[in-house]
Each structure stands twice: as C-alpha cells, then as structure tokens.
C-alpha cells in the first residue's frame, strides 16, 4: 500500500469498522477505530446529513487528513483504521484543535492496546 493512500474506501471495511470497532466520543466528534494488520494506518472523515456546506466539510476533511499524516507515525507498533464522524458544532475547528485531539486520541489508543 502506498504511503500517500491513507483513505478507507471499501464499503465493506467501513461497515465492519462501524460494527466491530472501538468507539470514543469527544465533544462534537465520534471516533471509531480498529487495529489492523496492514502496514499503514488509514482514516475516513465523514459527516451526518445535517452538516451543510461543502466548503466547510472539505476544509474540515483537509485539516484532519493533514494532522493525521503528521501523527500516524506515533502508531509504529500497530496500525489502526480510524473513522471520524464530525458534527456541525465542530464546523469551524482549526488546525491546532485537531492536532491536540489527534495526539490525545493516538495516545489513548496506544494505552488501550497495551
């Protein structure tokens, strides 16, 4: 798998992650994750239907992906797939907020694995 391809695209993988993955809720964001045997961690950012405005959705998506690229190397022992469900109250989230959320989330996931 190429390093730049960090997206989860398969419908079956997405459904399985929603059903069998671990769940964490942070204010305005639901996070599903599951450890995999792949060589790289992957991510999917999705939104409920009430989240209007493609420009805002795409901006949130770009910010999450960039922060994830920066921090997924912390998961060096085991790779995981993540789904972030972002709600409208987090529409104006900035890069630094996402950075702290992802850093705390990855530390939490590493502790849960051990």
Curated annotation (Swiss-Prot):
Quaternary structure annotation from Swiss-Prot or TrEMBL: Consists of a catalytic RNA component (M1 or rnpB) and a protein subunit.
EC class name: hydrolase
Organism name: Borrelia duttonii (strain Ly)
SUPFAM superfamilies named among the record's database cross-references: Ribosomal protein S5 domain 2-like
GO BP: tRNA 5'-leader removal
Protein name per its UniProtKB record: Ribonuclease P protein component
Cited NCBIfam families: rnpA
Catalyzed chemical reaction(s): Endonucleolytic cleavage of RNA, removing 5'-extranucleotides from tRNA precursor
Enzyme Commission number, as recorded: 3.1.26.5
Function as written in the Swiss-Prot or TrEMBL entry: RNaseP catalyzes the removal of the 5'-leader sequence from pre-tRNA to produce the mature 5'-terminus. It can also cleave other RNA substrates such as 4.5S RNA. The protein component plays an auxiliary but essential role in vivo by binding to the 5'-leader sequence and broadening the substrate specificity of the ribozyme.
Recorded superkingdom: Bacteria
Homology family: Belongs to the RnpA family.
GO MF annotation, one: 3'-tRNA processing endoribonuclease activity
UniProt KW keywords: Endonuclease, Hydrolase, Nuclease, RNA-binding, tRNA processing
Cellular component annotations (GO), alphabetically ordered: ribonuclease P complex
Listed Gene3D superfamilies: 3.30.230.10
């Amino acid at each position: 798998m190429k390093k730049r391809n960090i997206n989860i695209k398969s419908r079956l993988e997405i459904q399985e992650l929603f059903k069998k993955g671990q769940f964490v809720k942070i204010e305005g964001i639901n996070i599903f994750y599951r450890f995999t045997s792949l060589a790289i961690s992957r991510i999917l950012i999705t939104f409920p239907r009430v989240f209007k405005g493609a420009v805002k959705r795409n901006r949130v998506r770009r910010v999450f992906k960039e922060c994830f690229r920066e921090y997924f190397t912390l998961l060096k022992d085991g790779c995981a797939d993540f789904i972030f469900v972002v709600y409208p109250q987090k529409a104006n989230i900035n890069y630094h907020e996402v950075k702290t959320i992802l850093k705390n989330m990855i530390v939490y996931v590493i502790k849960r694995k051990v």
